[in-house]
Amino acid sequence: MSAGSGLKHEEHNVGDEDVNFLQIWIEPKLQNVMPRYQRRFFPKDKRKNKLQTIVSNEEGQEHCWINQNAKLSLGWFETNNTIEYKLNPLNKGVYVFVMEGALKSGNETIGRRDAIGFWETDTVTFTTEQESEFIIIEAPINH
């Protein structure tokens, strides 16, 4: 979703079952642009042991577009897989959020519903300690 010049937004769970989702807000590159909304379905089996881009600033049919030099990727990896993620030269920050499982980067283990940030690096490497689902959020960082 690109709000353009602003929006009012509410979320309500009208059902009886618990809902788990992430709501991620990224500041736009350009302000006051035409509002835009996209919806895509990302089957889990399409990302087994690989990263699947779900949001990017590049137009495409396989992911949603964003008005920012940002990229969001989902991963679903079996135990003992090593993932090496190379950052876009325009970006200087990556945030990895673990939805299920556990990842290890250096001496740090990141468990379920935990996250870690990386900046001032070109590559991020981590290993799955168990079967894991996670999202990588790459975006410009202003220091």
Question: Model features per residue range: what roles?
Answer:
Residues M1-H143:
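Jelly-roll (double-stranded beta-helix
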